[in-house]
Each structure stands twice: as C-alpha cells, then as structure tokens.
C-alpha cells in the first residue's frame, strides 16, 4: 500500500491524470482542529496546472470538496458552500461538501475533479506498439502491469497525483501552525545553469515570514531573488520555444519547528524527509542543511556553535542524528529537466523495436520545479506532523517538546 507519512499521520490517494477525479484520504488527524475549505484551496491554487505562464498550458481549476472527517453542530456553516452533482442512469444526484468544520479524529476524505483533459493526445503511446517517451515511466510501467496501464497524461505517475500531497499537507500545516507556530516556505534557487544569489534559509525569520510569503505568492517565479527570477523566467520562455526543457532546484524551509522529533537510525526524520522529498516526481537530489557544501570544510568550520540560548548557526539544517534541534528545517531539492520535449530522440516502442521518437501532441511543463514548492512544503509538513504524533505517543504525561 502506498501512503505518504505514517503510521501516525498518513495520506493516501487515488486517481489518474485523465481520470474523473483525484481522491484523498487523510488518516490520523487529531480531533478538534478547525479546517476551512477556503484555507486549503490557496495551496491547491499554487499547485494547479494553468496557474502560471511558465508551466503547462493545461488549465485545471482544482477546487477541493471535503466529503468526510469534519463536523460542527452548526450544520449551516458546515455545509454552506461546495456542492457535488453526479449524473447516473439518467438521474441527477446532488450533495453538499464540508465547507467549515472541525476534525473528529476519523479519516478525512476529499475530492478534486479533473475537467480539462485532452486524452486523444496520448494515442501515440497506446498498446504494445505504443511509443516510449525517453525519461518517462512508459516502458517500465507497461511491462510491470502486463500492459494494463493508463497512458493518458502519465496515468497515476502524473504530477496530478500530488493533489493528495497538497491536501494532506494543508491539513498538517494548519495543525502544526496552531500547536507550535510552524510555517513552511519554499523558494526556487536554480533554473538550468542560473543560480540565485540569495538563500531563503539565510533570509527567513518568524518576523519577516509574512512579507516573504506575500512577495513569493505574487511572483511568476517564486524566488526571493527577484533579479534571478526575471532571468529564469526569460530562460524558461526561450527554452520552451526551442522545444526543450530545464531542471531546477527548490529550497524548502520550515521555521517554528519543535525540537526532539524523530528517531536516530532507520526511522530518523532525515531518512523520512529525504525519502518524502526525494521521492517526488522528477526529483534527482535532496540535500539537508548546507548539503554538499560541507564536503570541503573542516570540522571546525562546519560545526554549529551552541550557547544556552540555542544553536548559533544552522549548517545542520535543523537535524542532528535524525532528530530536530529546534532550528529551522532546511532542504534543497533538485529536479531533472522535464522529460517531455518537442525534439527528435532515439527510443523504442513497447515491443522494443527501435524508433526515432518525436512527440505528436501533449501539454507539459517546460520546468517542473516552477510549481513544485507547495508540494515539497506539504510533504515536509506531513512528515513533521507524523513525528510530532510519534513523540507524543511515547512521551510521559505532562512532557512538553522543549530543548533550550
């Protein structure tokens, strides 16, 4: 079974790129936290295709409807808002979704409909003579499933599946912010060979986070380095015109992180975070803290000084021995160039006959890192909340999560 997070807080999903909808089930949410649809929707808006001129031309509205796991005695407030209509056997059925309620501790269910599909664009890849796109899962998934695979838009392997990540992560970050003041922010720090001259981790504080979030939310390229963002936007535009694609790197930071979370070895929070972030579609690398920059340093240069007030620097990225220190969690995630390009390439069909492949039709992102930040934030939030609940499950009564 594929789940994100777990065992204490976990998210599961279903749905293909060109299926009717993407569904989400959230397990382990503690009771008593207020979840409003209007607080979750902005995170999906950041993720959705068509919301950024540098992304895919596919334009989905991605409006979420909550179906289970929320309640309040004021049922007008609970139900007033979203509706779901289904036509079956020449009959129409309508029901309300949950708009504003409190978690009950039961599984939370949500659905997002898929309404902007051009499935005819993918006949090129159908059946045993279907062509294989280099860099995609076409070949391995076809043979793994004995040919029973949905080729439209990548099927279940599509980035559309991350709707589930963002819904689950939205609930996790609402709970973490209410309990600890934890906040999550991301900034694009590299596109192709262009690199940002500013680091989010070096800039972000609890005091300036609202200003930075507003600035990032208004930008086409969500980077704190505006000069870099403008140059990156032009580079993406020119690369798309040439039918090619670009890689990217995204810095993800969480502030207000409780200390003492995680395990030291096989379930360390470092292992889990690197797995969650590194397992996202198209990710090729994941670094914690200063990452590979620590390699040429000496120990005296790299160790973070400690005083009674806490750590004086954060080379360790908020994790030591897989356990949080209370310093900001810092990760840098690298994405490969989008595999779908409009240029001739050597490939095969699914019977392994050699061909010269050229894309007939399709819609895709020229740089997948552009809208990946919110998904990375969401995955970090899910793993962090799972670690909080794991800590609380083994803590002595009355223990608070405190180090300094």
Curated annotation (Swiss-Prot):
Cofactor note: Reduced FMN (FMNH(2)).
Main EC class the enzyme belongs to: lyase
Cofactor(s) for this UniProt protein: FMNH2
Reaction catalysed by this enzyme: 5-O-(1-carboxyvinyl)-3-phosphoshikimate = chorismate + phosphate
EC number: 4.2.3.5
Keywords: Amino-acid biosynthesis, Aromatic amino acid biosynthesis, FAD, Flavoprotein, FMN, Lyase, NADP
Gene Ontology molecular function, alphabetical: chorismate synthase activity; FMN binding
A family per Pfam: Chorismate_synt
GO CC annotation terms, alphabetical: cytosol
Coiled coil: none
Mitochondrion recorded as keyword: no
Binding site for FMN: 156-158, 281-282, 321, 336-340, 363
Entries under SUPFAM superfamilies matching the protein: Chorismate synthase, AroC
Residues reported to bind NADP(+): 47
Pathway connected to this protein: Metabolic intermediate biosynthesis; chorismate biosynthesis; chorismate from D-erythrose 4-phosphate and phosphoenolpyruvate: step 7/7
BP GO terms, sorted: amino acid biosynthetic process; aromatic amino acid family biosynthetic process; chorismate biosynthetic process
Annotated family: Belongs to the chorismate synthase family.
Quaternary structure annotation from Swiss-Prot or TrEMBL: Homotetramer.
Function: This reaction introduces a second double bond into the aromatic ring system.
Identification of the protein by name: Chorismate synthase
Higher taxonomy: Bacteria, Pseudomonadati, Planctomycetota, Planctomycetia, Pirellulales
């Amino acid at each position: 079974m594929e789940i994100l997070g777990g065992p204490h807080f976990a998210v599961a999903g279903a749905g293909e790129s060109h299926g009717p909808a993407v569904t989400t089930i959230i397990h382990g949410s503690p009771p008593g936290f207020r979840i409003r649809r209007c607080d979750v929707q902005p995170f999906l808006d950041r993720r959705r295709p068509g919301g950024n001129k540098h992304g895919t031309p596919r334009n989905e509205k991605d409006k979420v409807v909550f179906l289970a796991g929320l309640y309040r005695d004021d049922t007008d407030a609970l139900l007033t808002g979203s509706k779901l209509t289904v036509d079956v056997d020449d009959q129409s059925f309508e029901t309300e979704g949950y708009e504003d309620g409190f978690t009950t501790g039961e599984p939370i269910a949500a659905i997002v409909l898929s309404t902007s599909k051009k499935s005819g664009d993918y006949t090129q890849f159908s059946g045993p003579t279907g062509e294989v796109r280099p860099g995609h899962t076409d070949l391995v998934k076809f043979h793994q499933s004995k040919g029973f695979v949905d080729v439209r838009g990548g099927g279940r392997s599509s980035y559309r599946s991350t709707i589930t990540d963002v819904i689950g992560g939205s609930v996790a970050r609402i709970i973490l912010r209410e309990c600890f003041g934890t906040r999550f922010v991301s900034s694009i720090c590299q596109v192709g060979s262009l690199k940002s001259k500013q680091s989010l981790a070096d800039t972000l504080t609890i005091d300036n986070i609202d200003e930075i979030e507003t600035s990032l939310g208004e930008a086409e390229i969500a980077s704190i380095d505006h000069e870099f963002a403008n140059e990156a936007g032009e580079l993406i535009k020119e690369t798309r015109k040439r039918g090619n694609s670009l890689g990217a790197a995204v810095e993800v930071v969480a502030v207000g992180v409780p200390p003492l979370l995680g395990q030291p070895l096989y379930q360390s929070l470092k292992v889990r975070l690197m797995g969650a972030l590194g397992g996202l579609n198209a990710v090729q690398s994941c670094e914690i803290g200063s990452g590979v920059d620590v390699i040429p340093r000496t120990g005296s240069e790299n160790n973070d000084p400690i005083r009674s007030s806490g750590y004086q620097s954060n080379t360790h990225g908020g994790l030591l021995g897989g356990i949080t220190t209370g310093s900001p969690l810092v990760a840098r995630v690298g994405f490969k160039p989008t595999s779908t390009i409009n240029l001739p390439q050597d490939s095969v069909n699914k019977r392994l006959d050699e061909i010269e492949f050229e894309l007939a039709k399709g819609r895709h992102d020229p740089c997948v890192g552009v809208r990946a930040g919110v998904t990375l934030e969401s995955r970090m939030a899910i793993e962090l909340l799972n670690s909080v609940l794991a800590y609380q499950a083994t803590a002595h009564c009355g223990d608070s999560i405190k180090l300094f």
